């Protein structure tokens, strides 16, 4: 259901996101990112091909939902989602990464009507499933090493002042400095405690309750797209009578073939190693890199870490008409308004647009910015000049004034 919902949300912008007529043609993607995974979406840039692959992914997700040939359906979802996500990686959030990684482990778990013995067997897949979920919270906590998290406890002040994500409730909560300090300490404490509570069966229910409270609180304060629903759905796999995580006592022997068990134990070692390597900035040996690329298990979880970041702002696509008037192409042709928006939500039609635009500013790829400007100007015959502007409103320390600063990312003149 989670995959189907995510696919449905993309339908209005399928051509803009994934076709060669959209914001990231295949040639442009290959110029800014190395290809690391066999990709069906790169075979054609037509909207028809993209739609067919979208339908195939939805079919595999529906088969998985109905329990029909679950293992094959899960493998198809894993492969097709990797293909889709690679086609435009600037659209993704942490929830998409968790979804793909958990699908890998689910391919080796009894998702359909297996016998109770098989469901409760001791398997490296159950170990990997639990380890994967726990590592997300553990390394997200470890990454938060900046003093604003550990000593000053002002991190959530910076997080909730990122208006691209902040909800109306966040605008109200961030006004209290005391609340910010308490919530910062509480958030960090939850991220540290959840992975350990989930690991042992005696404390797992407490861990799941805290995980639920943690993510519902995040959803109330921040618009983070697939992150919250994905985390909650993946946590269902830790409930009793679902694919069960390992205990300290050995269970029924696993029925997976020996080579598969060896592969899964290697994958368990890899996901732990790569999280440490990313955190410590280690040089990863080529054989280890190759293993991660083949099975697409590379990951890192620096969510609002080590510092939550101060960058904030909004986009303006200024189009100057031939009569000299200026309009904002991103706001449907309204007059250009340089004032700070009262509500940032309408500036981002969806979470994928939010991710795309923020990555556009963070990565500063001139060719991508130029392509986006040209795409935004398509069909406009009345323009003389256009420019893509990011109004950077860097969040100052508490008590200091905000100073918006326009930055031009791309511009274009049109011939008469």
Model-derived features with residue positions:
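Alpha-helical membrane-anchoring segments
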Residues: 1-416
């Amino acid at each position: 259901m989670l995959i189907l919902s995510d696919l449905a949300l993309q339908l209005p912008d399928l051509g803009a996101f994934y076709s060669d007529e959209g914001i990231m043609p295949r040639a442009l993607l290959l110029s800014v990112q190395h290809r690391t995974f066999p990709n069906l979406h790169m075979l054609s840039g037509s909207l028809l091909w993209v739609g067919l692959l979208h339908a195939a992914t939805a079919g595999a997700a529906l088969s998985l939902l109905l329990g029909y040939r679950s293992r094959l359906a899960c493998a198809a979802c894993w492969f097709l989602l990797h293909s889709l996500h690679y086609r435009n990686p600037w659209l993704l959030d942490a929830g998409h990464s968790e979804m793909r990684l958990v699908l890998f482990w689910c391919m080796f778990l009894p998702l359909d009507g297996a016998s109770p013995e098989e469901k409760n067997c001791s398997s490296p897949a159950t170990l990997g499933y639990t380890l994967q979920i726990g590592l997300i919270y553990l390394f997200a906590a470890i990454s938060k090493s900046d003093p604003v998290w550990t000593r000053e406890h002002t991190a959530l002040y910076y997080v909730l002042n990122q208006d691209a994500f902040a909800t109306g409730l966040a605008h109200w909560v961030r006004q209290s400095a005391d609340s910010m300090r308490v919530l910062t300490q509480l958030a960090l404490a939850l991220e540290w405690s959840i992975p350990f509570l989930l690991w042992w069966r005696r404390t797992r229910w407490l861990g799941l309750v805290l995980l639920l409270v943690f993510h519902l609180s995040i959803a109330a304060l921040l618009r983070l797209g697939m992150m919250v629903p994905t985390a909650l759905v993946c946590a269902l796999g830790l409930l009793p009578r679902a694919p069960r995580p390992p205990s300290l006592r050995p269970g029924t022997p696993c029925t997976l073939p020996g080579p598969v068990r060896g592969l899964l134990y290697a994958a368990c070692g890899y996901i732990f190693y790569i999280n440490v390597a990313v955190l410590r900035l280690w040089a990863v040996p080529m054989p280890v890199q190759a293993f991660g690329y083949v099975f697409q298990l590379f990951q890192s979880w620096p969510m609002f870490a080590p510092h939550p970041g101060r960058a904030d702002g909004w986009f303006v696509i200024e189009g100057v008409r031939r009569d000299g008037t200026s309009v904002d192409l991103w706001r449907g042709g309204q007059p250009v308004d340089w004032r700070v928006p009262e509500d940032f939500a309408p500036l981002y039609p969806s979470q994928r647009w939010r991710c795309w635009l923020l990555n556009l500013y963070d990565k500063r790829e001139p060719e991508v910015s130029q392509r986006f400007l040209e795409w935004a100007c398509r069909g406009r015959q009345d323009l003389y000049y256009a420019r893509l502007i990011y109004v950077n409103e860097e969040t100052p320390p508490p008590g200091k004034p905000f100073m918006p600063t326009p930055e031009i990312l791309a511009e274009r003149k049109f011939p008469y």
